[in-house]
Amino acid sequence: CALPIFQADIGELLDLLCRDPELYVEVETNGSIDLSPQLKKPLRPSFTMDYKLSASGMEHHMFLPNLPLLTMQDTVKFVCGSQSDLERAWEITREYDLTHHTHVYLSPVFGAIQPADMVEFMKDHHMTGVTLQIQLHKVIWDPNKQGV
């Protein structure tokens, strides 16, 4: 079940889920929400924070104070739609030293930027510790197909 992180009482639900040692709890967030109340808890879920870059028109909503609080339990995913998005992702990764304290993924906006171009950028900038993530379902099936 997917629940938006900003729902009322979500913190209480996450606390209950994280107390169960048989459960692995991971929350994906769009990056605009302050995660510090959850990130500072000893028992907490893993977070995948999508960082929307300028091509999305949403970068101004990103909550940057989350970045230093993320750990190797978490992931930052930069959704890139242009060369300038790649450059910005690299800038943020270096500024916050992300690869030394959290997982970092680059993910292409399907059809907007070629994964091969992203790999070349990663090689040219020695982006070791950064993973390219492709939406495999859009490669395997028609990218407009629903329910896959």
How should these model regions be labeled?
Residues 5-148:
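Conserved AdoMet/S-adenosylmethionine-binding subsite of the radical SAM
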